[in-house]
């Protein structure tokens, strides 16, 4: 049995297969996922698992050099923004319109759906390197 943090087989496979500058997205329960984008659905019920719980677990295994967030998170969910920034204090942040973030999901290796039910709790992680 795997000993590291992420034990979901689909998610673990995606993370292991990512190279430098590849994208992985994590989002709330309501985020629409484009056809053709792999969806790893972890949602069980409202807020379970939370966006933050999933993000923390993914970050334990994925090197991240840049993140993409919806511009709207600044005013519509500043608590979530602060929590994201606390987890990734030294990572470059690009803010884009929510409509653009939704379109960009088509470029990600996978979308991880959480049970999160707060607005604009969506992120695209750009993988870095460990050397």
From Swiss-Prot:
The keyword Isomerase applies. The active site is at 20 (proton donor). It is found in: Cytoplasm. Belongs to the RbsD / FucU family. RbsD subfamily. This is D-ribose pyranase. Signal peptide: none annotated. Catalyzes the interconversion of beta-pyran and beta-furan forms of D-ribose. It catalyses: beta-D-ribopyranose = beta-D-ribofuranose. It comes from the Bacteria. One of its GO terms (molecular function) is monosaccharide binding. Substrate binds at residues 28, 98, 120-122. The keyword Heme does not apply. Homodecamer. It comes from Levilactobacillus brevis (strain ATCC 367 / BCRC 12310 / CIP 105137 / JCM 1170 / LMG 11437 / NCIMB 947 / NCTC 947). Its EC number is 5.4.99.62. Pathway: Carbohydrate metabolism; D-ribose degradation; D-ribose 5-phosphate from beta-D-ribopyranose: step 1/2.
